[in-house]
Amino acid sequence: MARATNAPQSRKRRKRLLRDARGFRGRRSKLFRYAKDALYKARYWSYRDRKNRKREFRALWIQRINAACRKRGMTYSRFMEALRKAGIGVNRKMLAELAVRSQEDFDQIFKLAKEGNLAS
């Protein structure tokens, strides 16, 4: 009896993997064995870094808000506390954008937070 190799399916699987490795350099895009390892690592890194991206952006927003607050004489943590007490519900992403692109609007929010904090 002849040996069954499942050749069509194996070829399809290898072809798909090499197609996914297009754009990689050298033998990582040409040879199945190296392409398989390269794809495994690429997928591992992309999964991991999708999680890290969220942390990095949050840290960036906090740094930008902190810089804008310190320029106006208050620390980041005091400013966030003042915002909460004043009942201003603007997220960090928007605050960071305002601090960088529209400083007049950030000044208004800062003033509101400061007044709201003094009132309570």
From Swiss-Prot:
According to UniProt, the name of this protein is Large ribosomal subunit protein bL20
InterPro entries for this protein: Ribosomal_bL20, RIBOSOMAL_L20_CS, Ribosomal_protein_bL20_C
Q: What does this protein do?
A: Binds directly to 23S ribosomal RNA and is necessary for the in vitro assembly process of the 50S ribosomal subunit. It is not involved in the protein synthesizing functions of that subunit.
Q: Which GO terms describe its molecular function?
A: rRNA binding; structural constituent of ribosome
Q: According to its UniProt record, which protein family does this protein belong to?
A: Belongs to the bacterial ribosomal protein bL20 family.
Q: Name one Pfam family in it.
A: Ribosomal_L20
Q: Does the keyword Ribosomal protein apply?
A: yes
HAMAP family hit by this protein = Ribosomal_bL20 (MF_00382)
Q: Name one GO biological process term.
A: translation
Q: Membrane-spanning regions, if any? A: none
Q: Does the record carry Ribosomal protein as a key word?
A: yes
| Keyword terms | Ribonucleoprotein, Ribosomal protein, RNA-binding, rRNA-binding
Q: Gene behind this chain? A: rplT
Alphabetical list of NCBIfam families matching this protein = rplT_bact
Instruction: Please give the GO cellular component terms listed in this UniProt entry.
Output: ribonucleoprotein complex; ribosome
